[in-house]
Curated annotation (Swiss-Prot):
This is Transcriptional regulator SlyA. NCBIfam families: PRK03573.1. Gene3D superfamilies: Winged helix-like DNA-binding domain superfamily/Winged helix DNA-binding domain. GO terms for biological process: response to stress. It comes from Klebsiella pneumoniae (strain 342). Transcription regulator that can specifically activate or repress expression of target genes. Homodimer.
């Protein structure tokens, strides 16, 4: 019987995320917070919520709850866009910058520990396969 690849990948993501959540707990953040802050930090300044949701790969309503939490923590600010009152622009606060550096350290160290014993070539092969599978899925979705 073949391995249930989808289940295996889902389980890997779950345990990886749980470890990240555990390691970010002292910073009072979660993996979801990190992904959101990381993307805000990487994107050009004052992106809209729509652009951020696309960059992360989630629906905008799913993003709003996380943004509410980050705003409550004083890590981001949201302002109504002057050209489109329905759109909100997102900006990191000064309080977020040092925290992002701490988070990146935690994530980097955790990633290195997870990948210990895995060669650079194995990681490159895995990334290649993931991209290939993702493209196959996107192609199938486009056909449906």
């Amino acid at each position: 019987m073949e391995s249930p690849l989808g289940s295996d990948l889902a389980r890997l993501v779950r345990v990886w995320r749980a470890l990240i959540d555990h390691r970010l707990k002292p910073l009072e953040l979660t993996q979801t917070h990190w992904v959101t802050l990381h993307n805000i930090h990487q994107l050009p300044p004052e992106q809209s919520q729509i652009q951020l949701a696309k960059a992360i790969g989630i629906e905008q309503p799913s993003l709003v709850r996380t943004l509410d939490q980050l705003e409550e923590k004083g890590l981001i600010s949201r302002q109504t866009c002057s050209s489109d009152r329905r759109a909100k622009r997102i900006k990191l606060t000064e309080k977020a910058e040092p925290l992002i550096n701490e988070m990146e350290e935690v994530i980097g160290k955790t990633r290195d520990e997870i990948l210990s014993g895995v060669s650079k070539q194995e990681v490159e092969t895995l990334l290649h396969l993931i991209r290939k599978l993702e493209q196959n899925i996107l192609d199938l979705q486009a056909k449906d």
